[in-house]
Amino acid sequence: MESKGASSCRLLFCLLISATVFRPGLGWYTVNSAYGDTIIIPCRLDVPQNLMFGKWKYEKPDGSPVFIAFRSSTKKSVQYDDVPEYKDRLNLSENYTLSISNARISDEKRFVCMLVTEDNVFEAPTIVKVFKQPSKPEIVSKALFLETEQLKKLGDCISEDSYPDGNITWYRNGKVLHPLEGAVVIIFKKEMDPVTQLYTMTSTLEYKTTKADIQMPFTCSVTYYGPSGQKTIHSEQAVFDIYYPTEQVTIQVLPPKNAIKEGDNITLKCLGNGNPPPEEFLFYLPGQPEGIRSSNTYTLTDVRRNATGDYKCSLIDKKSMIASTAITVHYLDLSLNPSGEVTRQIGDALPVSCTISASRNATVVWMKDNIRLRSSPSFSSLHYQDAGNYVCETALQEVEGLKKRESLTLIVEGKPQIKMTKKTDPSGLSKTIICHVEGFPKPAIQWTITGSGSVINQTEESPYINGRYYSKIIISPEENVTLTCTAENQLERTVNSLNVSAISIPEHDEADEISDENREKVNDQAKLIVGIVVGLLLAALVAGVVYWLYMKKSKTASKHVNKDLGNMEENKKLEENNHKTEA
């Protein structure tokens, strides 16, 4: 006869076996966990009062059970089965909640909580799902450049270590790129690591670019599922250099065209609007049908006025794409006749001409001894004051640095001319004798007393201005003397004498020579007097005309009055005659 304990064990074994076959209990329940986190699986059963123990198992793909944890309700002890993949990873709490640390992809199973009583086994299955967030997508193997109208690989978008696998999407300027035949080709593939069971997703984009893609950002994203639902991670932006052919050629001139003058260096610069820009061009010079092959610049040195004309440049492989510009080489010629050092005699005529030839209207300025003249000089009869340094200067205002100047150094020579004057001092105690000399080069003056031949050294001289100066002596002669003034320069020696009476004998004084400065003042005064006289004559003429008109009107009015008075007298006489006849 069997014991009561043996009977209980056989009953428990039968119940466990039947539980593995019939699986009574609650419906499906899912626990989501992130990769590497701790999986917490609650036992979704109410603990019965006659509970003997609780147990956890998972099911293999073929449905066979694998027990992993046991907890007795009476002994309060916990036992973990010898399952290598869960060694040191399990924890079973008092309420029979199972915790699995360091979640792995292999933990995606159907776990079952089992509560066993003496007469029954209760089960609650739970599905465990493990999710792994993929790495941030990255665009790799990027093209160095994209060419318009050519389908070319733009790059690969890669996202690694995902579970489950995700999807990759490409964007242009934030808008989704969809496959388009001949323009957008997207190739997607995924690979699973056999050890970690994590996925790597790769999407290759082939793209036909246009100029509209210049500076446009391209990105990609990975969409995946996590414990809390669907999420998306975006890559960094990638901007590509877009190559496109040249559609227009332009030509530039350095320095600016309006400032080119003879002697300058001209640099022609040809530009194409393609990317990359053309590095070589053909340059066409005026009158030359064949182009000169060069880089994007061509330099002409020391240009002359005959370089004026149309300059062109074109693409080497497409000569019809051409640009042109007109260049004017500005020039300025100045001819002064005569020029340099010129010597003429006083009274001579000297025509002077300053001829200008320029690419534009030029301004002409005359200077004499660094003082600007109001008009160009003209000499019909040279004077000493005409001597000096003359400069004819011209410039093109629009062209910086284009100016010319020629100079004329005029020397006016003349033989010495002498005029002597004398004047008695108002006190009557001395006489002033002046020798006025005119000539160039400056004559030397010497005073002597005729007869004795004595030389007078005590003299006073004025400054030498415009070929004139004077020498003055003051004497008190006790008897009549004759003074001689000698003036000499490289041209001639001139002598003049003057008789001077003794101081006791009164005589007529001669007027002093008028200096150039005083002469100008006299001329100005004469002009003023003439102006005043002319003004008075005009005023008198106007007054005479007004008076004549007034008198003419007065006479006409008088005639009308006399006529009226005569008529009145005649009428009066007629009336008297009529009265006499009636009587």
UniProtKB/Swiss-Prot annotation:
Q: In which tissues is it expressed?
A: Detected on hematopoietic stem cells derived from umbilical cord blood. Detected on lymph vessel endothelial cells, skin and tonsil. Detected on peripheral blood monocytes. Detected on monocyte-derived dendritic cells (at protein level). Detected at low levels in spleen, placenta, liver. Expressed by activated T-cells, B-cells, monocytes and thymic epithelial cells. Isoform 1 and isoform 3 are detected in vein and artery endothelial cells, astrocytes, keratinocytes and artery smooth muscle cells. Expressed by neurons in the brain. Restricted expression in tumor cell lines.
Q: Which GO terms describe its molecular function?
A: identical protein binding; signaling receptor binding
GO BP, sorted A to Z: adaptive immune response; axon extension involved in axon guidance; cell adhesion; heterophilic cell-cell adhesion via plasma membrane cell adhesion molecules; motor neuron axon guidance; neuron projection extension; retinal ganglion cell axon guidance; signal transduction
Q: Domain of life of the organism in this record? A: Eukaryota
Does the entry feature the keyword Nuclease, yes or no? no
- A Pfam family cross-referenced in the UniProt record is C2-set_2
Q: Where is this region: Disordered?
A: 562-583
Residues making up the signal peptide according to the UniProt record: 1-27
Q: Which residues are glycosylated?
A: 91, 95, 167, 265, 306, 361, 457, 480, 499
- Describe PTMs of this protein: Glycosylated.
Q: Can you list the GO cellular component terms from the UniProt entry?
A: axon; dendrite; external side of plasma membrane; extracellular exosome; focal adhesion; immunological synapse; neuronal cell body; plasma membrane
Domain (Ig-like C2-type) ranges: 245-328, 333-409, 416-501
Query: What CDD domains does the record point to?
Result: Ig
Chain ranges sitting on the Extracellular side read 28-527
- What are the residue boundaries of the Ig-like V-type domain, all occurrences included? 28-120, 125-234
Query: Which compartments does it reside in?
Result: Cell membrane; Cell projection, Axon; Cell projection, Dendrite
> Which cysteines are cross-linked by disulfides?
43-113, 157-220, 270-313, 354-392, 435-485
- Those parts of the protein on the Cytoplasmic side are 550-583
Query: Which residue stretches does the UniProt record annotate as biased composition, category Basic and acidic residues?
Result: 569-583
Entry-linked SUPFAM superfamilies: Immunoglobulin (SSF48726)
Record keyword Lipoprotein present: no
Describe, as the record does, how this protein assembles with itself and its partners: Homodimer. Interacts (via extracellular domain) with CD6 (via extracellular domain). Homodimerization and interaction with CD6 involve the same region and cannot occur simultaneously. The affinity for CD6 is much higher than the affinity for self-association. Interacts (via glycosylated extracellular domain) with LGALS1 and LGALS3. Interaction with LGALS1 or LGALS3 inhibits interaction with CD6.
> What is the role of the protein in this entry?
Cell adhesion molecule that mediates both heterotypic cell-cell contacts via its interaction with CD6, as well as homotypic cell-cell contacts. Promotes T-cell activation and proliferation via its interactions with CD6. Contributes to the formation and maturation of the immunological synapse via its interactions with CD6. Mediates homotypic interactions with cells that express ALCAM. Acts as a ligand for the LILRB4 receptor, enhancing LILRB4-mediated inhibition of T cell proliferation. Required for normal hematopoietic stem cell engraftment in the bone marrow.
What does the comment on domains in this protein's record state?
A: The CD6 binding site is located in the N-terminal Ig-like domain.
Spell out the protein name for this chain. CD166 antigen
From which source organism is this entry?
Homo sapiens
Q: What is the lineage of its organism?
A: Eukaryota, Metazoa, Chordata, Craniata, Vertebrata
